Amino acid sequence: GYVCSVESNNLTVATNNLDFLKVLNGALVNNCDGSVLAKILGKIHHEPLDSYIGADIFIKYVKMCRFRQFFLGNTPEVLAGLKSNLSKIDPKINGMRFETLPFRKVDEFDYEGIAKMINDDNPDIIWVSLGAPKQEIFMSKLEPYLNRGVMFGFGAIFNFNAGVGGVKRAPNWMLKLRLEWLHRALEQPQKNIPR
């Protein structure tokens, strides 16, 4: 199965695209990846809801040091930085797979071939970094070919933890005030403000 990290962009796409809504509805779990979204949904459902940020989920699982993990997507530079930094947390990560994917449309991937590569490695967790909404659609198409493991589509976490490429997580004071959305908008305005 797969887990999606749903923020306002994914929700907007799902509202306008029934196929993408089916992808989100097909997930094992959709975590609310934004405090503003949690507040809005809490008001709609008349109960307090909280967000659980994908970057926090990612680092929590890495720090557990007990899962075989597979890291899929992004660039060779980001994957090299990610492997180096995560190996400081869990040295076993040095022996885990970090694989890029060719840049192409989501319908053009060789899902059987990708699944064979993953199945041969036999991971518990498959982290997918292709950016939303592409990674969610990718996971839904890859799922039927996998023998085991849970996929997590948390795109920017590779960049946050790689220490390369200029994409950084918000400073702690912004995280405490739940202003990570503002930090991301200011860091990459052409990408995040239209969302």
Where are the regions that the model predicts?
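N-terminal nucleotide/polyanion-binding subdomain common to many enzyme families
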Residues: 1-50, 55-56
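Short glycine-rich anion-binding loops that position phosphate/pyrophosphate groups of nucleotides
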Residues: 8-11, 130-135, 157
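Short, conserved loop/helix-junction motifs that constitute active-site signature segments
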Residues: 23-25, 143-147
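Conserved beta-alpha
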Residues: 38-117, 121
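Short Gly/Thr/Asp-enriched flexible loops that form oxyanion-binding sites at enzyme active sites
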Residues: 83, 136-145
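Short, flexible loop segments at boundaries between secondary-structure elements
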Residues: 101-106, 147-185
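Proline-aspartate-enriched helix->loop->beta-strand connector
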Residues: 118, 122-132, 148
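A charged, well-structured terminal subsegment
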Residues: 184-195
